[in-house]
């Protein structure tokens, strides 16, 4: 197969030299009822969904303001001499002296200040450093021929001194107690300086004067490893910058690509099998989404193993909700690249299917529908039986959101076209669950959705529908016959036991009255006719009453808000937006 149009072939490793930038994109909206024509699959997004900066959601009601807490910080090695002298402005200095002045400012910005134990100390010198960083950001953005060979080691050193540090222990609980949607992130106290350092380095990488052949002496494997360690920072603003910087490095340094992928794999393995706690999984998956989008065809065995051994096991971690949109995007990208991977992916999802975690089950159903939107009919026929056995269990779930999400599959025209082509194998699997729950499910909304699904099946193949109804009736009769045989057998055993002389000594207390299910009778011919009439009327009513795009939300508790944290996250401007705005201004 030839490479896809997006694959340039510049990279010996099979990826583009420049993959699609992880530009901010709106989150995927719920699947609308009206789909493209049934012969067409839904096109996927070209960029991965961006990671949310703030995952804390409030369900309304009065706000409870929590007292602001001092934000803990990373462990910096503070400089002993922190007295900075204000240097002349770069734009006002003679051209021949600017390179030396630029280097002086870079070295001056290697001085580290205390923002935690004594935030009011050295205010004058902190302002000198902040102003110097701001000036260098503007200088490298709007000037040309300023990134000379002498600047590379100084810029990388300044970045390393300011950013590479020991991260503090997590302030939030780990394991089952950790709730990423409610536990507030710990913001970096030194952010006024760190933000400008990140902005400068990003502009440095994006500069037209930047030459990877020179920079590779300084941006090496050791640098990348230290950069990846920072992805565990609790501050989402920092992870947002790191994501963009690592993606730019991946695009510009071809020799580091395999190493970056390998180290990301190691982070994932440690997360899955050891710690189950890492703050940057969503951002790393967002980067990988763009990388996978640029893979050349046919896919290498290394990339297929990454899908099976890393991406699929990521589904079993407790904190899946934090990174699931990015993970689902990566999986779908692989299937669009190579449809033969569909069977192992769906089998893997069914293997990791949640047993007792209903919100997680809804996430799996969302992802499964995205996969079915891009599946080839030949691949669908390989997996439809185990797939619909699982869907039948979901339809029977007492958790109404799980049942509801599964039944929404019948509003997807492409999925319905696949079912129609394989109705003889799908309907016998689904009919018992649909019929049983049309009578017994506690939620009336589910009744309407079930009647809609039954109506579609009935219109699809009336004879097959009648056959399934008769088969279900026969199975119920067989079940009643087996139950009667079992009762008779126990009665015989009890009669034999009564013949024993010691029977009165060991006689059991009278049995409890039998427990009847909500559906004990075998469906009669009248029941079947009533079912058909009910399906027609209820399905029409359901289409009127139920919204086609219903967002499934997990209801959160009312927690005190940290006003400082909320304001800081709202004020943060994403790195890509910052770059786009500056480039348009040029």
Curated annotation (Swiss-Prot):
It comes from the Eukaryota. GO terms for molecular function: protein phosphatase activator activity. It is found in: Nucleus. Disulfide bonds: none annotated. GO terms for biological process: signal transduction. The modification Phosphothreonine is found at residue 47. Coiled coil: none annotated. Its main location: nucleus. A motif (Nuclear localization signal) lies at residues 532-549. Keywords: Nucleus, Phosphoprotein, Repeat. Residues 1-80 are annotated as: Disordered. GO terms for cellular component: cytosol; nucleus; protein phosphatase type 2A complex. Residues 23-35 have a biased composition (Pro residues). A motif (SH3-binding) lies at residues 507-514. The modification Phosphoserine is found at residues 72-74, 557, 582. Highly expressed in brain. Residues 36-45 have a biased composition (Low complexity). Sequence repeats lie at residues 21-22, 23-24, 25-26, 27-28, 29-30, 31-32, 33-34, 35-36. The keyword Glycosyltransferase does not apply. Residues 21-36 are annotated as: 8 X 2 AA approximate tandem repeats of Q-P. PP2A consists of a common heterodimeric core enzyme, composed of a 36 kDa catalytic subunit (subunit C) and a 65 kDa constant regulatory subunit (PR65 or subunit A), that associates with a variety of regulatory subunits. Proteins that associate with the core dimer include three families of regulatory subunits B (the R2/B/PR55/B55, R3/B''/PR72/PR130/PR59 and R5/B'/B56 families), the 48 kDa variable regulatory subunit, viral proteins, and cell signaling molecules. Interacts with the PP2A A subunit PPP2R1A. Interacts with SGO1. Interacts with ADCY8. The B regulatory subunit might modulate substrate selectivity and catalytic activity, and might also direct the localization of the catalytic enzyme to a particular subcellular compartment. Belongs to the phosphatase 2A regulatory subunit B56 family. This is Serine/threonine-protein phosphatase 2A 56 kDa regulatory subunit delta isoform. It comes from Oryctolagus cuniculus. The gene is PPP2R5D.
